[in-house]
Amino acid sequence: VTWDIQANTMGVKKSTELHISAVGLALEMIEEGDAICLGEVGRPHYQVSEHRWERANDMLLEIMRMASSSNVPIQLHVEDNGHQTCADLASLCDKAGLPRNRAVRHFASPDLTQENTSGLPVSVSMGKGSIERICSTIELSKSHWGMETDFLDDPKRPGAVLGPRTIPKRTNQLCQALKLMEWDDEKIERYILDVHENWISSTYF
């Protein structure tokens, strides 16, 4: 978003150079141990001109290459275009030499199918109806996933996103739903541990 706005005033070339420079600084911080992931990076999540869209993808590809060279995971802020979004991102990862399991799709839908994730780990927005969709696709999932609220502590925008209490609430709802699917307690416990801890370790460390 910032890149796109700046491109309107300083031009795409200068805006891109500025952002690539910022990514370089961020990667230095990660190397020094001040952070563990590069993000959010991505492309406009709203409609832009075809030329601007192509330049955004060019920049994202370069950022992925930089992350790959530094062996750093990235978190992606992108548009919601169904399964096509992750398919495009997976293709960019492959071109950049960045393992798909090191590119986390932020604010993803609760559709966990391989067709929808294309092998990318996803951070699922846990709004209403998310548990039902997760349970209906859970057996078709091959990617790691976690829960998120995209919590925004901004007094000027109350209710803009889900509050942090949503996660324990949804975790309990997921456990109850899995019991109804005849999962035993041990299997549920292992699965919840994967959702809240193990996938983070395997992705970011």
PLM regions and their residue ranges:
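Glycine-enriched alpha-helix->loop->beta-strand junction motifs that scaffold or abut catalytic
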Residues: 70-73, 95-100, 115-124, 140-145, ...
